[in-house]
Amino acid sequence: MFASRQSCAAEVERPIDPFVFARYDRCCYLYAHPVPASQVVTVISLSSSSEIKPEVSAEELRSLAPDPTDQARYLVAVRALCEFTAKAGDLDLRFTPSPTAQEGIAGHRTVAARRSPGYQTEVSLSGEYQQLKIRGRADGYDPALNQLEEIKTYRGELSAMPDNHRQLHWAQVKVYGWLLCQQLQLDEVNLALVYFNIVSEQETLIRERFSALTLQTFFQQHCAIFLQWAEQELMHAGERNQQLSQLKFPHTSFRTGQRHLAESVYKAVSTGRCLMAQAPTGIGKTIGTLFPMLKAAPTQKLDKVFFLTAKTPGRKLALDALTVIRTSAPELKLRVLELVARDKACEHPDKACNGDSCPLAKGFYDRLPAARSAALTAPWLDQAGMREVALAHEVCPYYLSQEIARWADVVIADYNYYFDLSGLLFGLSQFNQWRVAVLVDEAHNMVERARQMYSASLDQQNLNALRQTAPEALQKTLQRLNREWNALHKEQLAPYQAYPETPGKFLLALNLCVSAMGDYFNDHPQALNGGLQSFYFEVIAFVRIAELFDEHFVFDISKRALSSKRSYSRLCLRNVVPARFIRPRLTAARSSVLFSATLSPRHYYADLLGLPADTAWIDVESPFSREQLDVQIISRISTRFTHRQASLAPIVELLAEQFQARPGNYLAFFSSFDYQQQVADLMQQSHPHIPLWQQARGMSESERQGFLDRFTLESQGIGFAVLGGAFGEGIDLPGARLIGAFIATLGLAQLNPVNEQLKQRMAVLFGAGYDYTYLFPGVQKVVQAAGRVIRGQQDRGVVMLIDDRFAEPKVRQLLPRWWQL
C-alpha cells in the first residue's frame, strides 16, 4: 500500500518535470476510493476527542485493518459509528477525574476475573448494512446468562456522569447486542452496562433485556445516518481527487528556485521521505510547497495535508496561497480549515465550557449535525468563516472547528496541534490511521518551540498563594508538598543550580497532591476556581514531563529571596533536545517537509529535531541577484555588552548617513529593548527630523499591525525593533515599503545561568556547546531579519551588519551564499 522508502537523496536534487508524474496503480482516501471495492477497503474511524481513548486497544485497531477480500466499501468501528450518530446534549468540559489507560485496563481485568468460568472477554463481532461493514470487540459475554457487557471504568461519583455519556454507552452496547444476536442467531439478549469504580472496586450494573428485532431496528437506524454521510464524503473525495489530479500551477511560471522546491516536495511525498528545504525569503515557499503536495495527494492516497506554522502571519500566508490556488481553479472542491487557539475563538471567555454556563455549549451535540453539514458546504473555513457558521447554528466555534478537522482536506494550524504531546491533529491521525502529509513552515522555529512544548515548571509562590485560600480538605496535602519543596532548595546557596536527576520525594508528594486534588474536584465540582484549577493542571504537566526525564532534559531550581530568612524557588524540567518526541511525529506522516530560509548548518537541525537518517536536504537557489542587495559589514563597531555605551553614537550616525543618502523606509534591529531605547533616544536628540517608531514590549496584534502600517509606499522613516521578535521574520514589506535594514547585534542569546547550563549539555551531547546555544540560533535570527528587505525581482536594498564579529570566517560561512559581502 505504501511506496517503498528507497534512498532518493540524489534524486531529490535532480530537477524533474512536475507535470509528468509517476503513476501509482491504487489510490485510496479515507472515506473514498476510486478503485473497485474488491481492491481496497476504506477504514472510517472517528474519535470525538483529541486523545486516543484507552478503551481502544491495539488489538481492536488491528482488527479494523482493511481486508483485501472484503467486498464492503466502508469499514467502521462500533465506537466510531456511535460517536457520530448517538452523541446528544451539551458540551460539558467540567472536571471529571478519568482513570488512566493502565487503570482502565486493570479495571476491565478485575471485572472479568469476577465472572463465571465460561465468561468470554474481548468478543470480536462484525456485521453489515448495505455498503457498511461494522466491526468491534465487546468487553464480555456470559453464555450462561445470555448477557453481553460493556465495561466502563470511572472515578468519583457515578451520579456525576453526564446523561449524554450514558446514552452513548447504551448506543454502543446495543450495536454490539445486534451483532451478537446476528452472529449467534439469538432472539433476545441481556445487555448490561458495568460501571467499575477503580478506587473502591465496586461495580454498578445496569441491565436490560432486548429483542433481536428491537436491536436490529436500532442498528439500521444508526447505520443509515452514517451511510448517508459516508456516501456524501465518497462523492466529495472522488470529485476532489479528480480535480487535484488536473490542478495546474496558479501562476504563468515558476520563480527561480521555486520549481526546484516544488519538484523536491513532490518527490519526497512520492517516496515517503522527510525533506528539509532551505529556500531564500521571497522565493514563494508557501505556494511552492502547498501546490506539489496537493498535486500528489490523489496518487499518494493522502487523507489530509497539515500546514503548520509558528506564528499567526504564517497562517495568513498559507490562506493567501490557497486563495490563489482556488482562484486559478474555481471548480476545485477543497475543504480548507484554519485552527486557532481557544482564547482567540472563544465567544464567552467569562463562562465555563458546559451547558449550564455557556449558551454555545448548551445542546452542542444536538445542533452539531446541522452545523457540521453547513460548515462543509462552505468549505473556506478560516477563523472568520468558522465563526460565522458556528454562531449561525449556536454552537461553539472552537469545538466545531475541532470536529471539522476530521473532515477537512487541508488544515492550517500552529505547530502544537501536531507536535505537542496531546496535539489534536496527531492524535486524530493515529486513532483514525490517516495517511497525512505535514508541511512545517519557518521550520527554524521548531527547535525552540519544541523545547517549550516538552518542558514544564512550577513556581512556589503560586503554591504559597494557593495555601492561603485552599479548602481544609487539601491543606494537609499542600503543606506536605511545600515541606518537600523547601527541602529541595534548602541547601542550595546559588540562585540557580541544575541537578542530574529529578527529586524522588518531591515527585511522590506531587503525585499525592494530584490524587487529592482530583478527588476533591470530583466531590466538589462547584469549588473549581481559576487558581486551584490552574495549579492542578500545572502539577499534572510537571508530573507527566518528569516521567519522560532523561539526558535530554535539565532539572533546575531558581531561587529568589523574599527576605533574609525566606525564599521561594521555581522548579523547571527543561527539554533541551526534543528529537525523541519530534521524530515519531515526522515519521508517522507519509511525508514531512520542513522549510525555511535558515536551516543551516544541517547537523544542528538533524541532531535537535531527530530527523530520519534518509531525510533529503536541498538548498534552493536564490531568485535574486547579488546586485539587488548591498550587504555591508560594519566591523568598526562592537555591540558587545561591555562596548554598548560606546556604540550608541556611531550607530546613530550610521543610520542617519544612510537615511540622508537614500531616504526611505528602514528597519533597525537591536539585541534588547533597553539597547533599542538608548539608540532611539540619541537618534531623536541628534536627528529629530528623521521619523522613527519603536516596537514596544507585549504589543497586541492590532498594535503590531499598527507598527507595520507605518511602512507605506510613500512614507519614510526607521522602525526600531528587537531581533528575534515579531518583526524579525514572517512579515512582508515589498518594494518601497522597506528598502533597508540595520542589524546591530549578532543575535546571541543572553548570557545567563540557564543558557550556560544549556551550553554545557550541548557540549556533552554534541561537542559544540557555544555553537548550538549561541552562534547558530543567533546568526539564524540575523539572516531572517535581513530577509525582510528583498521581496521581489524589482526590489533593491541595503543590509548593514553592525558588529566586528560578522567579519569572522566562522560567522561569514553561516551567511547566505548569494550575499555579496
Predicted regions span which residues?
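Signature of the SF2 helicase/ATPase Hel1-core->accessory helical subdomain module
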Residues: 393-410, 415-516, 597-611, 750-752
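Walker A/P-loop
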Residues: 271-292
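A substrate-engagement module of RecA-like helicase motors
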Residues: 241-242, 248, 301-411, 416-419, ...
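Mg2+/Mn2+-dependent nuclease catalytic core
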Residues: 125-217
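Conserved pre-motif I regulatory segment
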Residues: 236-278
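Conserved RecA-like P-loop NTPase helicase motor core
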Residues: 635-646, 696-805
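A contiguous, basic/glycine-rich beta-loop/short-helix subdomain that forms a polymer-engagement track
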Residues: 386-411, 422-429, 521-638, 646-647, ...
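Metal-dependent nuclease catalytic cores that hydrolyze phosphodiester bonds in DNA/RNA
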Residues: 25-30, 34-146
